[in-house]
Amino acid sequence: MKQTLDQIFKLQDNHTTIKKEFLAGFTTFITMAYIIFVNPQIMALSGMDQGAIFVGTCLAAAIACFVMGFFANWPIGLAPGMGLNAFFTYTVVGEMGYSWEVALGAVFLAGVLFFIMSITRLRAWMISSIPLNLRIAMGAGVGLFIGLIGLKNGGIIVGNQATLLSLGEFSQIETLLAAIGFLIISILSVRKVTGAIIIGILITTLIAYFVGLIEFNGIVSYPPEIAPTFMKLDILGALNLGMLTIIMSFLFVNLFDTTGTLLGVATRANLISNDEKSDGLNKALKADSSASIFGTFFGCSPVTSYVESSAGVEAGGRTGLTSIVVGLLFLFAMFLSPLASIIPPYATAGALIYVAILMLSGMEKLNWSSTAELLPALVIIVMIPLTFSIADGIALGFLTYVFLKIFNGEFRDIASGAWFLTLIFISKFIFL
């Protein structure tokens, strides 16, 4: 067994051991396991069966981790991503009125485009076409979007006709528990406790049980049926001009988030220099992009690489065996459906708020000295949550960037890819 694993994952060449890889895999899983509770709650609001999404989340994550482990041999955990699942539910289905089947079709098409870009030079062309400030802003804007949803789900922020928004009533036990959950996660994170997010969710749920807000239905059972969402995507329905900016939004956020995550985690593991020309990176991108494609078969929003994988790297993970362990743990998690079904939205609200704050950390890399690039970035960051749409926020910020460049006499600095995207975004606001 040891010799076989060494041959497959090159353990000795990467100066690691089976024990280290298993520990790293467990560490990575614990830090990202919150997604098996949060994702079904968010996606179910689009009309999908929550039990089926729970199983789909576990299966999509497991298969994605297996592909990453065996094909790329990198210690990366993958699962349906935060942010795009909210965009899927609240914007594409909730606001724009598309069915969740058509929305899954859009995710599939975005995944196909991502895969094509990963096996050609289109990825480098697209990344170079969009300034770094705007790429950073997309992540931060999505973070605020997630944060607003978390605050809303927890009752911490409520609607107000006079002031648009106002602070919720902390006399409501659900609102108080949401705030307590966030504080628990924050305290554990400050104290560097592994799995702070999932621990916070479980403690908040436990408190809710003791105060009589929820009923205990057990922890372990056979997985629910996946049939209600399995292979239900409507690709033909997504092939219309109205879905173009939605598909591009899924693509952009996934592309930039994945590239940044893979570069950051791999550099930390000494698997790559901080560039984008590594064979290992190319394989990892192919694995990630293919995961977004087959994830739709299980009813999932885009599957992506998790920055939480860095926790596993810190624990010693250096090869794909770490990813395989993460995938196996996701398979075992399918039997925890009774636990997942009783976790209330206010118990996961604190997790959403905390993840949102983490996503804002990239703003430190913004170029604050260039007004022409800073203003469009801030437009994206502000408008994504205020329009409740990742697509609209990106479009408004990008058009602001192009117009500022044109009227500042710097239109020659606008890349060809940027002109192409400008036409798409202008068409969206005029014709769609």
Locate the predicted segments by residue.
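Helix-loop-helix hairpins and the membrane-proximal interhelical loops
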Residues: 1-52, 165-167, 199-282, 423-427
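Residue-level signature of catalytic and energy-coupling elements of molecular machines
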Residues: 22, 42, 126, 195, ...
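Helix-loop-helix junctions within the multi-pass membrane cores of secondary transporters/permeases
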Residues: 2-39, 60, 80-139, 267-363
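Transmembrane alpha-helix interface/packing and boundary motifs in multi-pass membrane proteins
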Residues: 64-77, 186-192, 250-257, 288-298, ...
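Helix-coil boundary and interhelical linker segments in multi-pass alpha-helical membrane proteins
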Residues: 41-53, 91-102, 241-244, 344, ...
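Membrane-embedded alpha-helical modules
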Residues: 96-210, 214, 324-432
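Conserved, well-structured core segments that form the ligand-binding/active-site neighborhood
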Residues: 75, 205, 209, 316
